[in-house]
């Protein structure tokens, strides 16, 4: 039985596609082990089939000099730990999905001369993937990469982002109610949530009265936004973290979200129209480039956070929710450009390397 190690961590954008591929490869007869970090514990209920995983003792890099020193020490320890474990396991292939949690595993693969495959979800390659791009046999990408050097171009394969979200049957604004979904990313980076909440409260009465809001909120915003919606009679469901993303996305008439590639893949797989608000501090502005790409495909609207205020949010919502044809056009474009067979395409790459 061929052994495959997958490595991802930090955010759901890295963890979810890695966990999905881990399950699919295991179903195809591979022995799979997922190397990740503490953030995976938020997703164990979603992936109950994954029993073989290793939690690397990593922490966030940001937070001052002391935190940086702690991060470096834990990263070094994780490198040693990964090397010892991989020497014992003797994997046939290592697949890195980005984030610092993948660094120790990919470094160990390089030291052991084990073949490696990278998956870059975003349109701009992340730091860890850039480090190992030269070593990797294949660079699988979720979105078309903006810049790829001539030395790497032959390695790139556009496979999409593995997702378990299926195409929704429901058409946007097909019923009387309007299901608005506001997501903040797996790290709860929904600083724009209150802005859109205030904008929803200012929508024309004929639209506001039909709205049901499902919204991911940080702890500091939950009480404030709950009170705001209650005061304006807006039906709502708020939470810091949702586990049933497939149903939430599938039932949405319009989604408002950050522009991480995994979220985009889920939204497009469901064929949902969306407003994307890129996280300003995303590395190399990758969320901005992601959102601009989707906007150019006619599958979503990109609003930069620096230009976002209550007025612009209200106008965008009013224009879209008042135009069923526009939402349906965006929905069709999202479904048209989705890659629902990403896991199968990725498996074909793995099969080619290990069975070919």
Curated annotation (Swiss-Prot):
Pathway: Cell wall biogenesis; peptidoglycan biosynthesis. It comes from Anaplasma marginale (strain St. Maries). Keywords: Cell cycle, Cell division, Cell inner membrane, Cell membrane, Cell shape, Cell wall biogenesis/degradation, Glycosyltransferase, Membrane, Peptidoglycan synthesis, Transferase. The lineage of its organism: Bacteria, Pseudomonadati, Pseudomonadota, Alphaproteobacteria, Rickettsiales. Belongs to the glycosyltransferase 28 family. MurG subfamily. Its main location: membrane. It is a peripheral membrane protein. InterPro entries: GlcNAc_MurG (IPR006009), Glyco_trans_28_C (IPR007235), GlycoTrans_28_N (IPR004276). The gene is murG. One of its GO terms (biological process) is carbohydrate metabolic process. SUPFAM superfamilies: UDP-Glycosyltransferase/glycogen phosphorylase. Its EC number is 2.4.1.227. This is UDP-N-acetylglucosamine--N-acetylmuramyl-(pentapeptide) pyrophosphoryl-undecaprenol N-acetylglucosamine transferase. CDD domains: GT28_MurG. The keyword Cell inner membrane applies. It is found in: Cell inner membrane. GO terms for molecular function: UDP-N-acetyl-D-glucosamine:N-acetylmuramoyl-L-alanyl-D-glutamyl-meso-2,6-diaminopimelyl-D-alanyl-D-alanine-diphosphoundecaprenol 4-beta-N-acetylglucosaminlytransferase activity; undecaprenyldiphospho-muramoylpentapeptide beta-N-acetylglucosaminyltransferase activity. It catalyses: di-trans,octa-cis-undecaprenyl diphospho-N-acetyl-alpha-D-muramoyl-L-alanyl-D-glutamyl-meso-2,6-diaminopimeloyl-D-alanyl-D-alanine + UDP-N-acetyl-alpha-D-glucosamine = di-trans,octa-cis-undecaprenyl diphospho-[N-acetyl-alpha-D-glucosaminyl-(1->4)]-N-acetyl-alpha-D-muramoyl-L-alanyl-D-glutamyl-meso-2,6-diaminopimeloyl-D-alanyl-D-alanine + UDP + H(+). UDP-N-acetyl-alpha-D-glucosamine binds at residues 11-13, 122, 186, 287.
């Amino acid at each position: 039985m061929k052994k495959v190690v997958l490595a991802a961590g930090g955010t759901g954008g890295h963890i979810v596609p890695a966990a999905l591929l881990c399950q699919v490869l295991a179903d195809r007869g591979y022995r799979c082990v997922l190397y990740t970090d503490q953030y995976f514990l938020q997703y164990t209920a979603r992936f109950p089939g994954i029993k073989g995983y290793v939690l690397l003792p990593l922490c966030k890099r940001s937070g001052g000099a002391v935190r940086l020193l702690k991060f470096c020490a834990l990263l070094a320890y994780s490198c040693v730990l990964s090397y010892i474990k991989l020497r014992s396991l003797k994997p046939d292939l290592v697949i890195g999905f980005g984030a610092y949690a993948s660094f120790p595993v990919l470094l160990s693969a390089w030291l052991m001369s084990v073949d490696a495959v990278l998956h870059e979800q975003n349109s701009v390659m992340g730091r860890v993937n850039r480090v190992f791009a030269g070593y990797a046999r294949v660079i699988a990408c979720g979105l078309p990469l903006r810049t790829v050097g001539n030395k790497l171009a032959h390695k790139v394969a556009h496979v999409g982002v593995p997702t378990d979200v299926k195409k929704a049957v429901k058409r946007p604004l097909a019923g009387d109610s309007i299901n608005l979904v506001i997501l903040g990313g797996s790290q709860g980076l929904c600083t724009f949530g209150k802005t859109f909440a205030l904008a929803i409260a200012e929508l024309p009465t004929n639209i506001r009265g039909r709205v049901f809001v499902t919204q991911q909120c940080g702890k500091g915003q939950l009480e404030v936004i709950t009170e705001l919606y209650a005061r304006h009679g807006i039906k709502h469901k708020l939470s810091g973290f949702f586990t049933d993303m497939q149903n939430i996305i599938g039932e949405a008439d319009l989604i408002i979200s950050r522009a991480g590639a995994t979220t985009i893949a889920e939204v497009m797989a469901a064929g949902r129209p969306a407003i994307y608000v890129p996280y300003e501090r995303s590395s190399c502005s990758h969320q901005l480039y992601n959102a601009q790409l989707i906007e150019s495909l006619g599958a979503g609207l990109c609003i930069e956070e620096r230009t976002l205020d209550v007025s612009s949010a209200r106008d965008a919502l009013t224009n879209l929710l008042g135009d069923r044809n526009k939402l349906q056009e965006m929905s069709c474009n999202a479904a048209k450009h989705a890659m629902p067979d990403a896991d199968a395409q990725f498996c074909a790459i793995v099969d080619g390397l290990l069975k070919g």
